[in-house]
Structure formats: C-alpha cells, structure tokens
C-alpha cells in the first residue's frame, strides 16, 4: 500500500498550498479595496470606478457534453479498492434509471448530502481498447477565470489535459490550458515543470502533482490560471494575461487511466473497476465585463434565445462591455483599471 499512497502530510500540504495560491489570485483578480458592487462612488454617478461582477463558480448548472458515459446499455461497474480480489463491491449504471444514471451534467449540479451525484464513463471492460474520454463545458459567455478544480470519485487520471476557448465562436480552435501527467514529455511532448518566460506567457504547462493513483476516491486536480506567470502582479498592463484568463468554454481530455497493472490479466471484475468518475467541476471566476459592469444578466434575443450579457456602465456597450456606446467615442475604448475607470466620453 505504501507504494502508491501519498502520505497524509503531503496531501495536507497540497491542499494548503492550493488554498494559498487561490487566495492570492482571488485578491489579485478582484479589487483589494472592495470596489466591485458599484461602478460609481457616489449616487450622482459623477465618480466612476472600476467594477466587477461577483466571484462565482462559472460552471454551476452549465451544460456538459461527453463522448463517453456509462449506462447505454446498462452496465456493471465495481468499486476500486486497490486489492486484487475475486469479490468486489459492484453495482449497475443505467441511463434510464434516475437512481442509477450518471450523466455528464452531474459534474455541474448542486452538491449536498441529499444530492450525491457524479458523472461516470464506461469501464475498461466496455471501453477496450481504451479510447480517451472528453468532457466539454460551455460557459455561455466569456469569464475571467482564476482557477479550475476537478474532484474525482474514481482515481485521478495518469494523464489529462484542459483546453479552453476565448470567444463563444464554436469554430475557434481549442487552446491548451494545462497538462497533468506522470509522463509529460511522452504523452504531451511538454517538458515537466517548465518556467514561463516573460516573452511567452500564454503557454500551457505540465505537472505530475495530481497524477498519482492515490487517493482512490475524492482526489482533486487543480489549476490556477496565473500561477507562475511573470506579469501576474501587473495584470492591468498585460494584454497577454488578460486574454489568457478569458474563457468561454472548457474541454477536459482524460487521456490515460491510472491502474495497478492488473488489467493485463483480463479479469472481468478488475476491468469493471477501472473507469473515470467526476463528482464536481468548479470554475472560479467573474463574468468578463472589462471593469465596466457590476452584474451580468440573461437577456432574450429577437430569436428567442437567452444570452448572458454584462449590464454595462461607464457609457460602454457590448456583451462584455468591450466597446463605447455610439456618440461616446471621444477617446478610444479601454478596460477599467484600479486607478482609472476609463469612462467612454461623449463627443458633444
């Protein structure tokens, strides 16, 4: 057991270090002076300030698509214990049974003691030879993303990758965001633990930090978007990092499964114990409004479709407040910063 189980101290340190990184990024992407609820300091709206929507889990209740989900047809799976034994705790996945189904949308639903749900892929008994599994989440609009955290019910993958799209254009190519692997160079042709250079801050890194088979359940995979980026403390003046955190859709590729090596013997119950299962996906961030809105709301388009948009202030317009209103183009549009709200000015 000692071969594959991390020490308790190491697990606690990883959790603690993640919380420290997360706290730093929340303070950085937010406003240290608390100016996020209003776009003006005064009731007369004469003192504009940078404003932002509240920090949220951008993935919550968003639709998820997967190329591989158990239950069609119903299939049996077994709980991984780490011990090869002819007797395993097994049950069924059945997409037509509300109590036995595990669809992809279960990774973004509400989680509590009364709603212990998860998504699950087919087992190695069905997905054999193994083919990578993909999950895609459409956020519905661009967000400034601070972190992504995935909590697994199964052992974490040996290799997985996160990709993103910046815009809502479905034809936009996927951009690599982060790689996780015990074999970074072999699997992704990326050297592990690289240092980001100031000249290229939009580069996906690879780490083996979350690729151990232990714990067998409840393990997290976490990624903070600005960690290790040279200009992370000068975000207002870094267009490269502003684009790097901008995310409208996320793709998770589960490329290699962690096993104990016993699958090579072909035992059916052993193969039934290997699959991917995710309890929860959290995408921490703010609705992207470029510092010109304190809220985002769904608006109905003439077509009847609902669209998430910023409620723009400072005489700005657009889904992300990314432009000036007509007749307010006395100077070029600009993002609001902590020091300057960069209000669009009238020509008259």
Predicted regions mapped to residue ranges:
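Cleavable N-terminal signal peptides of Sec/SRP-targeted secreted and luminal proteins
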Residues: 9-34
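Disordered, acidic Ser/Thr/Pro-rich linker "stalks" and the adjacent N-terminal cap
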Residues: 2, 30-140, 183, 194-230
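Short coil-to-beta strand junction motifs in C2/discoidin
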Residues: 153-161, 271-276
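Intrinsically disordered, low-complexity linkers and tails
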Residues: 242-253, 258-313, 322-348
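Short, surface-exposed beta-strand/strand-loop-strand elements in extracellular ectodomains
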Residues: 158-170
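Surface-exposed loop/edge segments in extracytoplasmic proteins
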Residues: 117, 169-178
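Hydrophobic/aromatic beta-strand segments within beta-rich folds
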Residues: 64, 132-152, 162, 195-268, ...
């Amino acid at each position: 057991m000692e071969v594959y189980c991390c020490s308790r101290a190491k697990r606690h340190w990883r959790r603690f270090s993640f919380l420290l990184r997360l706290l730093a990024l929340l303070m950085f992407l937010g406003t240290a002076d608390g100016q996020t609820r209003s776009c003006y300091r005064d009731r007369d709206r004469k003192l504009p300030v940078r404003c932002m929507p509240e920090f949220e889990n951008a993935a919550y209740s968003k639709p998820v698509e997967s190329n591989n989900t158990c239950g069609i047809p119903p299939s049996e799976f077994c709980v991984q214990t780490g011990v090869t034994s002819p007797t395993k705790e097994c049950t069924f996945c059945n997409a037509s049974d509300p109590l036995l189904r595990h669809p992809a949308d279960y990774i973004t639903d509400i989680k509590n003691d009364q709603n212990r749900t998860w998504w699950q892929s087919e087992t190695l008994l069905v997905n054999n030879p193994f083919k990578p599994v993909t999950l895609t989440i459409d956020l519905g609009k661009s967000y400034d993303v601070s972190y992504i955290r995935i909590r697994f019910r199964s052992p974490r993958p040996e290799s997985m990758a996160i990709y993103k799209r910046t815009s809502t254009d479905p034809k936009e190519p996927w951009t690599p965001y982060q790689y996780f692997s015990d074999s970074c160079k072999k699997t992704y042709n990326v050297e592990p633990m690289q240092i980001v250079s100031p000249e290229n801050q939009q580069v996906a890194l690879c780490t083996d930090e979350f690729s151990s088979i232990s714990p067998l359940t409840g393990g997290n995979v976490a990624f903070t978007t600005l960690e290790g980026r040279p200009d992370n403390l000068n975000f207002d003046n870094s267009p490269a990092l502003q684009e790097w955190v901008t995310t409208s859709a996320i793709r998770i590729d589960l490329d290699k499964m962690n096993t104990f090596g016993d699958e090579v013997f072909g035992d059916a119950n052993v193969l039934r114990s290997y699959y991917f299962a995710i309890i929860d996906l959290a995408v921490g961030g703010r609705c992207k409004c470029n510092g010109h809105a304190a809220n985002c709301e769904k608006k109905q388009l003439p077509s009847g479709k609902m669209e998430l948009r910023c409620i723009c202030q400072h005489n700005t317009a657009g889904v992300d407040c990314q432009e000036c209103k007509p007749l307010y183009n006395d100077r070029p549009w600009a993002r609001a910063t902590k020091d300057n709200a960069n209000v669009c000015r009238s020509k008259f």
